[in-house]
């Protein structure tokens, strides 16, 4: 392997400048229009020139280590804006643009919690969110239009964006918001050859990753330059990347996997990445595979659902045009990795060169910058067939494949026991090999704080073992990230079993909600197209199981929801020994998710408690219906009692 790593780079921005100096004309990023047309290619020199222009403007309105909001499209402008913050040693805060009620509420929450007074956005978002941005400006936030700064440098412009004098830049908002009326002329006369030398130090904050978690309230994970560059080294080593690596991606830039894994890892290595918009992939999953085939991509991946979507929607006739022999690392993470998905994907695409050894299950999270561990890089994914009943008791016991077993995919091969530990969350002590506990992580890549939230930082990012009972004194002094994930280590390999907060405990047995949800969604092919959330609820001292299932409007009109509810109750009783007391059939996109697509079960539970959901149809068991009527909190929701 040809190494491209310089171990003494103090920060990633220094590494980027090294590439800009030594191979200025090399391709850094290519952006595809509609996931198919090669529209824009950007070299390292281009990136340096454009980011320097924006950084100069930042220097006139920002102090060192001041937070800057980045609400930009998934294209070159996002990367330029991010690099500009790094050049000026500012704190980048990527945030989804405030389009739509939910995103606007999240955006407002991040503005307030971060205390940011500067926002970098684009001309199209200034137009579409003009009233909202004007309100921010009235509150003292400086809103900067990146398109006006890069006029003449960013060519060709993304489709639908005009130049600074075009119709997509509302002058009254732009002028009022930015307070930089003289910025245009200063940029035109600015000599981009007078580059900026970054002052960032390893312990300075590089950016803040806002993650919603299970409750829906954004929390900002502080990523220092030291965290970032250590995680880049970990990714490079584990993925076996070198100077011949070529990336391809459809992941959103605001997601940690998209930013850290697909923008910054190529930048760190000095290699190219080919991007397509997330919507282009969702519309036609074939586009992703065609990109890999056309540009001879070696590393590309995403959540499990992306592979499932390809296996389901790519037509056999399309496969004949693909050549996936270049695809060495097909990373699969961000949500539970399913053996069934891996098997179906390989079966469908092996004929066009996809190797089973390329599939690479990974585990990570924003609090660890991104990457924590991965499976065996040069072997087929490893899976355990385990006894489902023993898993309910917190033990991983091998079993033959049958109706009483389930599969777990390895997401960490030969892990470092000092960095990844399985801990009993009650006693705060490590558990034995093969026992399920909470996954705790430590290392230079792990964040030390949440932005402006010291209490949460102490409880989640600085956990320690119970030193009074721990025989390993050195390890008991370490501070760990409590991931909130449940898992086990078997023969040195890591297996993820679920989320601690989502765990359903009934009659002393542990049930993982995604297992229950998977059982229910197999009852009808149409159910798998939409989200399903399972959790425990309570009225007074009575705990009960609730399922919320999104359904298509056409299904709701068929009049068969009562039969479906009966099937759900019977199936859960037969497969899991559980009584289902409450079912809500709701419209698509009702169940809230995180920005990375994970179900927010706690948030869904809260929405039901607040009567914030109008179900299409609902069922309550005879055990719960009288309590609902007496309690009064859910009385209006009852429409069917069996």
From Swiss-Prot:
E.C. number: 6.2.1.47
Alphabetically ordered keywords of this record: ATP-binding, Fatty acid metabolism, Ligase, Lipid metabolism, Nucleotide-binding
CC terms in the record's Gene Ontology section: plasma membrane
Catalytic activity: a medium-chain fatty acid + holo-[ACP] + ATP = a medium-chain fatty acyl-[ACP] + AMP + diphosphate; a medium-chain fatty acid + ATP + H(+) = a medium-chain fatty acyl-AMP + diphosphate; a medium-chain fatty acyl-AMP + holo-[ACP] = a medium-chain fatty acyl-[ACP] + AMP + H(+); decanoate + holo-[ACP] + ATP = decanoyl-[ACP] + AMP + diphosphate
Biological process, per Gene Ontology: Actinobacterium-type cell wall biogenesis; fatty acid biosynthetic process
Domain of life: Bacteria
SUPFAM superfamilies with a match to the protein in the record: Acetyl-CoA synthetase-like
Name of a matching Pfam family: AMP-binding
Signal peptide, first to last residue: none
GO molecular function: adenylyltransferase activity; ATP binding; ligase activity
InterPro entries (alphabetical): AMP-bd_C, AMP-bd_C_sf, AMP-binding_CS, AMP-dep_synth/lig_dom, ANL_N_sf, FAAL/FAAC
Similarity section: Belongs to the ATP-dependent AMP-binding enzyme family.
Role this protein plays: Ligase likely involved in the biosynthesis of a polyyne metabolite. Catalyzes the activation of decanoic acid, followed by the loading of the activated decanoic acid onto the acyl carrier protein TtuC. Decanoic acid is the preferred substrate, but it can also use 10-undecenoic acid and lauric acid. Nonanoic acid and 7-octenoic acid are only weakly activated.
Name under which the protein is recorded: Medium-chain-fatty-acid--[acyl-carrier-protein] ligase TtuA
Organism: Teredinibacter turnerae (strain ATCC 39867 / T7901)
